[in-house]
């Protein structure tokens, strides 16, 4: 359930994960400031596709610009971090207000994407690719 911060404003928290990235998201009512690792959102996420992925839970719930969001993200690359931020924002929105549960759940934002890189096997070139086979 959502907690209150020092000023008495509702504070939602959520942890999102994707590949090897982890994002801790803190949401509170505000004017729409988004900070990732103490940097502005537009400075940290420069690709438009990744911005769309990261902010999709806010766009879906029509809450873009209503909340101040503070994100601490580490691990992985920018694509995995964008997915982790999306998962974390969805969980934080759900923590803040449970009315969003049906919308977020039906679009798969509350579900952890469990796909990870498959490990390389010995006797193979990569995870599944084999060395060239010669019959003779």
Swiss-Prot record:
Protein's GO biological process: translation
Cellular component, GO annotation: cytosolic small ribosomal subunit
Residues annotated as signal peptide: none
Pfam families per UniProt: Ribosomal_S9 (PF00380)
Keywords noted in UniProt: Ribonucleoprotein, Ribosomal protein
Domain of life: Bacteria
Record keyword Ribonucleoprotein present: yes
Example GO molecular function: structural constituent of ribosome
Gene3D superfamilies per record: 3.30.230.10
PANTHER family, per the entry: RIBOSOMAL PROTEIN S9, SMALL RIBOSOMAL SUBUNIT PROTEIN US9M
HAMAP family in alphabetical order: Ribosomal_uS9_B
Family membership noted in the UniProt record: Belongs to the universal ribosomal protein uS9 family.
NCBIfam families named among the record's database cross-references: PRK00132.1
Protein name in UniProt: Small ribosomal subunit protein uS9
Phylogenetic lineage: Bacteria, Pseudomonadati, Spirochaetota, Spirochaetia, Spirochaetales
